[in-house]
Curated annotation (Swiss-Prot):
A GO biological-process term: DNA damage response
InterPro entries: 5'-Nucleotdase_C, 5'-Nucleotdase_C_sf, 5'-Nucleotdase_CS, 5_nucleotidase/apyrase, Calcineurin-like_PHP_ApaH, CpdB_N, Cyc_nuc_PDE_nucleotidase, Metallo-depent_PP-like
Subcellular location, record wording: Periplasm
Protein name per UniProt: 2',3'-cyclic-nucleotide 2'-phosphodiesterase/3'-nucleotidase
Keyword Metal-binding: yes
Chief subcellular location: periplasm
Family: Belongs to the 5'-nucleotidase family.
Top-level enzyme category: hydrolase
Transmembrane intervals: none
MF annotations from Gene Ontology: 2',3'-cyclic-nucleotide 2'-phosphodiesterase activity; 3'-nucleotidase activity; metal ion binding; nucleotide binding
Binding site for a divalent metal cation 2: D76, N116, H225, H257
Function of the molecule: This bifunctional enzyme catalyzes two consecutive reactions during ribonucleic acid degradation. Converts a 2',3'-cyclic nucleotide to a 3'-nucleotide and then the 3'-nucleotide to the corresponding nucleoside and phosphate.
Length: 647
């Protein structure tokens, strides 16, 4: 016993002599979507609100504030802007360096992971792109279908030289692991089916963290391209960050995917979230928005007093590049990065400026969430015409009526960007305008759905709206921003219908039934008659919707055919063809849907948010289907309009 005590004492003395404290900063970008420049290619104008060339200034400042730092990217990097479109159209051969990696290499990133949109262009394109990165990538849950092994390096433990508080050099073994939503198997089925499988995010991290610790990792950092939800855990959940914070051995979570900001007030009600400290169940976590509008910063203090490194203090924050309230830039351009990107930036501007046709009228999306809209109409017109031409001569498909489903993609972001609306002016149209009207490189897929399924599809779309109390005169918000993504608000053309917002939603934002007796879709007709529940229809949509299986009438068993063409290319070709045939396109909405009139003797105060611009105000005055008047501006900058649905 005496001998044991002496040994223990010697160990404690040795640990005390070698004790050190290290401050480590982990910085993160996420969901850059190829927005390298502070430039809005859709409007052909500079911006102070996004772009890595501005985030770079925050990165440089954050680095200079501390002795020890690392920088990670959380994915959705190579897709999502006209720069990405330009590179995809140009093609990326072996040896070519994608502009995003010219930028990230210049900023000396430490490690990166993959987002779901990395798979949009196929595995070969992704492989060629990743070859240009001068830093390693990790992903643990995408599995090679042939070898049954991880397709990418699942995790990495990097020996990192740091300086402790006494100025002495120490070595930290920092472990990085990456994960991506399993839903990529549906979203990019054409690119991934038979080539990869994807495992559950939480179980993957739970499996690997002990292994990383056994191999010597002093710190474990999870790069999770996944959002934050407090819903009960489900296997293969898309948004799994909350569950990751409950896994022992995880020291920091750098996340994204949801285009939101954590820590932030939107997440204050989640149990276990400390917005002041930036922690989830005690684990520091950060999600820095999108397009470089924020830099994520996690600060860890580590001590090895016990003989091994342990986190003793932790906090996280998301630093903005722009002060929305005061309309002021908080980050200057990084001139070195601007110069690095100049040639690709100029080429992108040329690429999106190619003329494709003409429009007889303006196309703005200011009212796309409250009435039928020209920006959605032209997409549906193009998709419907494409499918009707495609099925000619097919004895099985040609006899079926064609419908088309499209959603508004630019209607204020996730209620975080009052400038994010489609603004296509009448006159000459370019590829820039087609890309503005259809943001994503989705491919056109056609599903076969029954009349009953079309009705249920629309019922899920109607979850876009909050339930309105017809007996209340208090202000009521019409748009369900928190529980429903606007890109799921499908408008189906080829049928006519009304949406009764006084009824409860039948489905939640994930198309899970929540009120079996509720029905919001009223007066659904096809060719002027009530739709036959048993009649079959072809519905043109995109690969995300068709393969996702979330909406009624979608999923593998419903696929009628998969076209080789992107929806955006279909739209551009339709604009060109119509302009050749008729001189210009006429993008007026056909008003096949509307919000059902709310009867009653009370004057309701129903409100919705949209762009605060004078252009929006003029458009609303001219094109509004219901009486609308502006009553306020919210703290983010959205204009708040009151709408009269009594008629």
């Amino acid at each position: 016993m005496i001998k044991f005590s002496a040994t223990l004492l010697a160990t404690l003395i040795a640990a005390s002599v070698n004790a050190a404290t290290v401050d480590l900063r982990i910085m993160e970008t996420t969901d850059l979507h190829s927005n390298m420049m502070d430039f809005d290619y859709y409007k052909d104008t500079a911006t102070e609100k996004f772009g890595l060339v501005r985030t770079a200034s925050l990165i440089n400042d954050a680095r200079n504030e501390v002795k020890n730092s690392v920088l990670v990217d959380n994915g959705d990097l190579i897709q999502g802007s006209p720069l990405a479109d330009y590179m995809s159209a140009k093609g990326l051969k072996a040896g070519d360096i994608h502009p995003v990696y010219k930028a990230l290499n210049t900023l000396d990133y430490t490690v990166g992971t993959l987002g779901n949109h990395e798979f949009n262009y196929g595995l070969d394109y992704l492989k060629n792109a990743l070859a240009g990165a001068k830093f390693p990538y990790v992903n643990a849950n995408v599995i090679d279908a042939r070898t049954k092994q991880p397709m990418f390096t699942p995790y990495l433990i990097k020996d990192t030289e740091v300086v402790d508080k006494d100025g002495k050099k120490q070595t930290l073994k920092i472990g990085y692991i990456g994960v991506v939503p399993p839903q990529i198997m549906g979203w990019d089925k054409a690119n991934l089916s038979g080539k990869v499988t994807v495992n559950d995010i939480t179980e993957t991290v739970r499996k690997y963290v002990p292994e990383m610790r056994e191999k010597g990792a002093d710190v474990v950092v999870v790069l999770a391209h996944s959002g934050l939800s407090a819903d009960p855990y489900k296997v293969m959940a898309e948004n799994s960050v909350y569950y990751l914070s409950e896994i022992p051995g995880v020291n920091a979570i750098m996340f994204g995917h949801a285009h939101a900001v954590f820590p932030g007030k939107d997440f204050a009600d989640i149990e276990g979230a400390d917005i002041a400290k930036g922690t989830l169940n005690g684990v520091p976590a950060v999600m820095p928005g999108m397009w470089g509008d924020h830099l994520g910063v996690v600060d860890l203090q580590l001590s090895n007093d016990s003989g091994k490194w342990q986190v003793t203090q932790a906090k996280a924050e998301a630093r903005p590049i722009y002060d929305i309230a005061n309309k002021k830039s908080l980050a200057a351009e990084d001139s070195k990065l601007v110069e690095t990107l100049k040639a690709d930036h100029d080429a992108t501007r040329q690429f999106v400026s190619k003329p494709i046709g003409k429009s007889a009228d303006n196309m703005y999306s200011y009212l796309a969430l409250v009435q039928d809209d020209p920006t959605v109409q032209v997409v549906n017109n193009a998709q419907k015409a494409y499918v009707e031409h495609y099925i000619q001569g097919d004895p099985d498909l040609a006899k079926l009526p064609v419908l088309s489903a499209a959603a508004p993609f630019k209607v204020g972001g996730r209620k975080n960007d009052p400038a994010s609306y489609v603004e296509v002016e009448k006159g000459q149209l370019t590829f820039r305008n087609a890309a503005d009207l259809y943001l994503y490189p989705n491919t056109l897929i056609v599903v076969k759905a029954s009349g009953k399924e079309v009705k249920e599809w629309l019922e899920c779309s109607a979850g876009q709206f909050n339930q309105i109390d017809p007996n209340s005169t208090k202000p009521q918000s019409l748009i369900n921003w928190d529980g429903f993504r606007t890109y799921n608000f499908d408008v189906i053309d080829g049928v006519n219908y009304q949406i009764d917002v006084t009824q409860p939603a039948r489905y939640d934002g994930e198309c899970q039934m929540i009120n079996a007796n509720a029905e919001r879709i009223k007066n659904l007709t096809f060719n002027g008659k009530p739709i036959d529940p048993n009649a079959m229809f072809l519905v043109a949509t995109n690969n995300y919707r068709a393969y996702g299986g979330k909406f009624a009438g979608t999923g593998d068993s419903h696929i009628a055919f998969a076209s080789p063409d992107e929806n955006r290319s279909v739209l551009a070709a339709w604009i060109a063809d119509e302009s050749k045939r008729a001189g210009e396109i006429h993008p007026a909405a056909d008003n096949n849907w509307r919000l059902a009139p709310i009867a009653g003797d009370k004057k309701l105060d129903i409100r919705f948010e949209t762009s605060p611009s004078d252009k929006a105000a003029a458009f609303i005055k001219e094109k509004g289907q219901y009486p609308m008047n502006k009553v306020a501006t919210d703290d983010i900058g959205f204009a708040i309009y009151q709408v009269d649905l009594s008629k």
